[in-house]
Regions:
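Conserved N-terminal catalytic core of the sugar/cofactor nucleotidyltransferase
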Residues: 2-5, 13, 27, 31-104, ...
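Histidine-centered beta-alpha loop that forms part of the nucleotide-sugar donor binding/catalytic region
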Residues: 8, 54, 134-135
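A structural signal for short hydrophobic beta-strand segments in well-ordered beta-sheet cores
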Residues: 25, 145-147, 197, 206
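Short, well-ordered beta-strand micro-motif
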Residues: 27, 133, 146, 174-176, ...
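Catalytic-core segments of class I nucleotidyltransferases/pyrophosphorylases
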Residues: 101, 108, 114-121, 137, ...
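A short, conserved acidic/glycine-rich loop-to-beta-strand motif
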Residues: 124-134
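Conserved catalytic core of nucleotide-sugar-dependent glycosyltransferases
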Residues: 142-154
Length: 226
């Protein structure tokens, strides 16, 4: 299994904290966000870790070079932001031959990532991917799912005005090899939540965590947990 950490964002909603620091390197409890994810990946059998970069990329590259798993890491620098789906499909030749963890690195949570992988391995056969979800106290600010009795997503709406549930997308996924065969490589994808997820209703398994989960892309959330 490989992993793809999305770390290219500019963090505009986190100013002034991101004026001189890339979003993935801002600190939560005195540790850069990126390190939480790298340390979690160190606990499991990951073959290769891909990290996309853009904003203040040299700072991210310098930080990654110091990590003990640097020999497993491949940096994918984007001269122009490709978006969460664009980054994935621009590099599909690197990803398509193995299962892959896809993680938005500007999130923070303490959960056991191995439990997510085990859930994915026991998913119903029609499901191409597994989405980690949590109970959101503010569902209007999240991507909200409805699931059936088998924990399969039957609807997904990004930031709904009238949420039909409080089950929210963590933006942490396990993608199967079959997932990559579902789409044409030359399709013009940009955002994973808007361009990909809605096309996969009935094919997304879910794994719900009970731990707290935070989207650190918002300054209000960051001030709450930093």
């Amino acid at each position: 299994m490989n992993a793809f950490l999305l770390a290219a964002g500019k963090g505009l909603r986190l100013r002034p904290y991101t004026e001189n620091t890339p979003k993935c390197l801002i600190k939560v409890k005195n540790k850069p966000l990126l390190d939480y994810w790298l340390n979690e990946l160190d606990k499991i059998n990951i073959s290769k870790i891909f990290i996309n970069t853009h904003y203040k990329s040299e700072m991210v590259h310098s930080h990654i070079r110091k990590h003990k798993s640097f020999n497993k890491i491949k940096i994918l620098n984007e001269k122009k932001l490709l978006g969460t789906a664009g980054s994935l499909f621009q590099n599909i030749k690197l990803f398509k031959d193995d299962n892959m963890l896809m993680i938005h690195a500007d999130n923070y949570s303490k959960f056991n990532i191995l439990n997510l992988i085990n859930a994915h391995n026991s998913r119903p056969k029609q499901c191409l991917m597994t989405m980690m979800i949590f109970n959101s106290p503010n569902p209007k600010t999240c991507g909200i799912v409805e699931i059936d009795k088998n924990k399969i997503v039957k609807s997904f709406v990004e930031k709904p005005k009238k949420p039909l549930s409080n089950l929210a997308n963590c933006a942490v996924y396990v993608l199967s090899k079959k997932f990559f065969k579902e789409f044409k490589q030359n399709e013009n994808f940009y955002d994973f939540s808007h361009d990909i997820l809605p096309k996969l209703m009935g094919k997304i398994f879910t794994f719900k965590i009970n731990e707290s989960f935070f989207d650190v892309g918002h300054i209000k959330t960051y001030n709450l947990i930093k």
